[in-house]
């Protein structure tokens, strides 16, 4: 049999080019079997009590910690994340289980209220099996931050993972099995686009959650909408990182480098468009370029390296094409702009200056280790530039004037604002975007309630 991306998911080590695994796409029988298991699993799971489900979350966290190094090594091998960052992803995911186990049950408690002397109760009921289409850039965290609250709420979770991280998908499934989660409550299968469409249409899928590109999210969202099924979309971002003249320069540069080059720049909610007030622009740019140049790129298994390869060669080629287009449009190259010689999908840390709003690096998401610097005349101009985007995931403001920062935050068109810090996600607070960055929220009680039937029960209303 000829193996091609049309017939199989192919996982390739991005650091070496070595083929890691090959898995055929799920056929109609595989999909039907998965849906049958999911339907049966949900029927039983929804009847379990919340304390039992919370305890199972703790078991998932324990099972994940027991396989922590195995999981981290798999993440690094399949998508090139530097090993220390992969270990941090595993630890964060295990902690998420504990947090929802401790706090989630209270968030799902019935809420009684009086309405004109009549008793009413808001109940949080499960919806059914949720189809989750997840990306490769945080192959564990993205799955866990959806699966954990979804399962706690009494739903089932059916994963379609990115084809280049099938080893991660298999290992995550093993973690849930180790924790005693029934197969039909947590499941996964290697579905292609046609398989995804088939599942969305099926009545045994209650809702869909997607993390991915705008193009993929729009296509899947349209299918979910046609089936009148709820959909949560966490899509791309081109986050502005605003530095005003009164900012703490050293702190801003440190955060800028971390915010742009974490995970080799392959993060949806990450600093991408650096909007710098002109009075501090020269000093910021000089220090930022020096700090980016000092980053160590190489084998992601080496703990000394902070930059690894990009996850796929086609993504590296697309990024390089975006850089070349931006330079042809008049931007100035201050650092990098080249593929690293030798094996692997490495792209050197890159800094572009004199970037203006009509250029590619400003208009499009740069999903890799490329920073685009734009000069703002003043704070008002910085806000205008920041909002001049089809994306609205998150934003950063660096200034020592907290009052002004909060005033600016209120006018930024995005789902999250970071004042004197860089983008992060945490179980305790909501995460999501606006505009073409998607809709719906993950994490906190908002993420827990997204996939609940919020049911009002009236008593003795005549």
Labelled PLM ranges:
Residues 1-118:
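N-terminal Rossmann-like NAD(P)+-binding subdomain of aldehyde/semialdehyde dehydrogenases
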Residues 6-9, 271, 393:
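Short loop/turn microsegments at loop-to-beta-strand junctions
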Residues 16-22, 205, 242, 296-297, ...:
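Conserved C-terminal structural/oligomerization subdomain of aldehyde/semialdehyde dehydrogenase
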Residues 17, 53, 75, 97, ...:
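Residue-level signal for inorganic ion chemistry
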Residues 19-26, 41-47, 132, 241-244, ...:
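Short, well-ordered beta-strand elements within core beta-sheets of diverse protein domains
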Residues 42, 46, 61-68, 72, ...:
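Structural signal for hydrophobic packing residues in well-ordered secondary-structure cores
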Residues 109-251, 376:
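Rossmann-like NAD(P) dinucleotide-binding subdomain of oxidoreductase/dehydrogenase enzymes
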Residues 215-356, 419:
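ALDH superfamily catalytic-core signature
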């Amino acid at each position: 049999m000829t193996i091609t991306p049309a017939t199989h998911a192919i996982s390739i080590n991005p650091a070496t080019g070595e083929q890691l695994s090959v898995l055929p796409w799920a056929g109609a029988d595989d999909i039907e079997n998965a849906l049958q298991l999911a339907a049966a699993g949900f029927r039983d799971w929804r009847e379990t009590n919340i304390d039992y489900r919370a305890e199972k979350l703790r078991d998932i966290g324990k099972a994940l910690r027991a396989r922590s190094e195995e999981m981290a090594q798999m993440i690094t091998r399949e998508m090139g994340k530097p090993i220390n960052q992969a270990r941090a992803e595993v630890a964060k995911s295990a902690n998420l289980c504990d947090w929802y186990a401790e706090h989630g049950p209270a968030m799902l408690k019935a809420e009684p209220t009086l309405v004109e002397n009549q008793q009413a109760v808001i109940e949080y009921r499960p919806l059914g099996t949720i189809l989750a289409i997840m990306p490769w850039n945080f192959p564990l965290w993205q799955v866990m931050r959806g699966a954990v609250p979804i399962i706690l709420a009494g739903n089932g979770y059916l994963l379609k993972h990115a084809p280049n991280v099938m080893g991660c998908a298999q290992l995550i499934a093993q973690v849930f099995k180790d924790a005693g989660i029934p197969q039909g409550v947590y499941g996964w299968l290697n579905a292609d686009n046609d398989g995804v469409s088939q599942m969305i249409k099926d009545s045994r899928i209650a809702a869909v959650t997607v993390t991915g590109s705008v193009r993929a999210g729009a296509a899947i969202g349209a299918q979910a909408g046609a089936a009148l099924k709820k959909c949560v979309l966490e899509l791309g971002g081109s986050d502005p990182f605003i530095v005003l003249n009164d900012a703490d320069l050293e702190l801003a540069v440190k955060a800028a480098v971390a915010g742009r080059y974490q995970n080799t720049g392959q993060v949806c909610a990450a600093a991408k468009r650096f909007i710098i007030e002109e009075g501090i622009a020269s000093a910021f740019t000089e220090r930022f370029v020096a700090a980016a140049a000092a980053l160590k790129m190489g084998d992601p298994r080496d703990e000394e390296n902070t930059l690894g390869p990009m996850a796929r060669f086609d993504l590296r080629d697309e990024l390089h094409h975006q850089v070349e287009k931006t330079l042809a449009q008049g931007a100035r190259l201050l650092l990098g702009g080249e593929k690293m010689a030798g094996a692997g999908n490495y792209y050197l840390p890159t800094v572009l200056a004199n970037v203006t709003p009509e250029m590619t690096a400003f208009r499009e998401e740069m999903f890799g280790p490329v920073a685009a610097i734009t000069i703002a005349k003043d704070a008002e101009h910085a806000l205008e530039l920041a909002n001049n985007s089809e994306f609205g995931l998150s934003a950063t403001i660096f200034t020592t004037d907290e009052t002004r920062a909060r005033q600016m935050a209120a006018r930024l068109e995005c789902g999250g604002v970071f004042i004197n810090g860089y983008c992060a996600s945490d179980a305790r607070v909501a995460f999501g975007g606006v505009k073409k960055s998607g809709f719906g929220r993950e994490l906190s009680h908002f993420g827990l309630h997204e996939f609940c039937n919020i049911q009002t029960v009236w008593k003795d209303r005549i």
